[in-house]
């Protein structure tokens, strides 16, 4: 293995086009040499969500220049890069095709190995880049396409303990915002309105709370919000703020129950891991300050470290893709063949039951 490998990462699974260069030394320490992300928010905001065809075209238009910029910011050329890592799933198939085909072309032309990376694995391993975290640990992934509680045992070794049985949490935020006439993306808009709201005005349901299994459900909560809004329409600004605050409180209480049970299970299964156990949160919804505070308090109560990587590394980015490639390289995983195909569905836990449905931001995995 190259003693100080350097990887170019490419991410195009949804509505961010990203490229990054990351290197790792023999002790596992990393350096982010560049991190370039182009959001497609303006392209999709008029539609209230991500339009797959528009996303794919935007990736085509932007990716080559972003890769050049990532190399320039890192002050390296392709000759200085040891491998290419590109997201190959899960996600929107059009975007995945753009990124993976670009990665293949670069790997072929430059004579570099290619790592086809699972987007979820990128999220799962980010805390090892930012915090030097050791295995095992728990990860809560909360985004527009996924809500999963995952046991991370090692690189390529994952067990899904819980997942949404309907809407992802980010999807619930977006749909609630749209219902209330708030702008896209919905998460930040709902959080802003909630700051001025009365969280006790509406007693929204907390689906699956109290159940032993660790799954999530948010469609019933979304329906309750719609019915409450219809009952008091037309809505004043204060009504909207109160609904948002009550919605967030219901989610916080749901996560407190679901994740609390997960932390207890972790302690039962790993009673003596030699260090303080950790809960990692990732995904765009991880930016929500109320949810972070809930998880921090839960971890404090249960004797866990709470790790939330910087927001730029919680949302979709190419740093995590490059890092996942480096992690695989470090344990001797062979590169992928150049005929590897993108996968719209690609669960981290190959033994997990297949999920039903197709989320707002792509196939559920």
From Swiss-Prot:
Pfam families: TsaD (PF00814). Binds 1 Fe(2+) ion per subunit. GO terms for biological process: tRNA threonylcarbamoyladenosine modification. InterPro entries: ATPase_NBD, Gcp-like_dom, KAE1/TsaD, TsaD. It is found in: Cytoplasm. Belongs to the KAE1 / TsaD family. One of its GO terms (molecular function) is N(6)-L-threonylcarbamoyladenine synthase activity. It catalyses: L-threonylcarbamoyladenylate + adenosine(37) in tRNA = N(6)-L-threonylcarbamoyladenosine(37) in tRNA + AMP + H(+). The lineage of its organism: Bacteria, Pseudomonadati, Pseudomonadota, Alphaproteobacteria, Hyphomicrobiales. The keyword Transferase applies. It comes from the Bacteria. Its EC number is 2.3.1.234. One of its GO terms (cellular component) is cytoplasm. Its cofactor is Fe(2+). Fe cation binds at residues 119, 123, 316. HAMAP family: TsaD. Substrate binds at residues 141-145, 174, 187, 288. The gene is tsaD. This is tRNA N6-adenosine threonylcarbamoyltransferase. Required for the formation of a threonylcarbamoyl group on adenosine at position 37 (t(6)A37) in tRNAs that read codons beginning with adenine. Is involved in the transfer of the threonylcarbamoyl moiety of threonylcarbamoyl-AMP (TC-AMP) to the N6 group of A37, together with TsaE and TsaB. TsaD likely plays a direct catalytic role in this reaction.
């Amino acid at each position: 293995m190259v003693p100080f490998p350097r990887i170019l990462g490419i991410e195009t699974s949804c509505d961010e086009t990203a490229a990054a260069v990351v290197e790792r030394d023999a002790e596992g320490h990393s350096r982010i040499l560049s991190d370039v992300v182009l959001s497609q928010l303006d392209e999709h905001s008029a539609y209230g969500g991500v339009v797959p065809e528009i996303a794919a075209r935007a990736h085509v238009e932007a990716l080559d220049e972003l890769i050049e910029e990532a190399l320039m910011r890192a002050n390296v050329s392709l000759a200085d890069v040891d491998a290419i890592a590109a997201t190959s799933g899960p996600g929107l198939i059009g975007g995945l095709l753009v990124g993976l085909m670009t990665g293949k072309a670069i790997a072929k032309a430059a004579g570099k190995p290619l790592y086809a990376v699972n987007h979820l694995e990128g999220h799962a391993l980010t805390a090892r880049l930012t915090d030097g975290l050791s295995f095992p640990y728990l990860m809560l992934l909360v985004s527009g396409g996924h809500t999963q509680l995952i046991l991370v045992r090692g690189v390529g070794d994952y067990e899904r303990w819980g997942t949404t049985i309907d809407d992802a949490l980010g999807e619930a935020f977006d749909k609630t915002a749209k219902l209330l006439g708030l702008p896209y993306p919905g998460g930040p808009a709902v959080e802003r309105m909630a700051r001025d709201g009365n969280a006790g005005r509406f007693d929204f349901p907390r689906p699956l709370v109290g159940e032993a299994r660790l799954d999530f459900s948010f469609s019933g909560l979304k329906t309750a919000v719609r019915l409450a809004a219809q009952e008091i329409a037309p809505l004043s600004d204060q009504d909207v703020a109160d609904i948002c605050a009550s919605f967030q409180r219901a989610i916080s209480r749901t996560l407190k129950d679901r994740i609390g049970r997960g932390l207890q299970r972790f302690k039962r299964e790993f009673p003596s891991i030699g260090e303080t156990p950790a809960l990692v949160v990732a995904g765009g919804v991880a930016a929500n300050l109320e949810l972070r505070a809930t998880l921090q308090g839960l971890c404090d109560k249960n004797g866990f470290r709470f790790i939330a990587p910087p927001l730029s590394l919680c949302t979709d980015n190419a740093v995590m893709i490059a890092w996942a490639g480096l992690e695989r390289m470090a344990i001797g995983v062979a590169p992928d063949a150049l005929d590897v195909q993108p996968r719209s569905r690609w669960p981290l836990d190959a033994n997990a039951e297949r999920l039903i449905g197709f989320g707002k931001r792509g196939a559920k995995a």
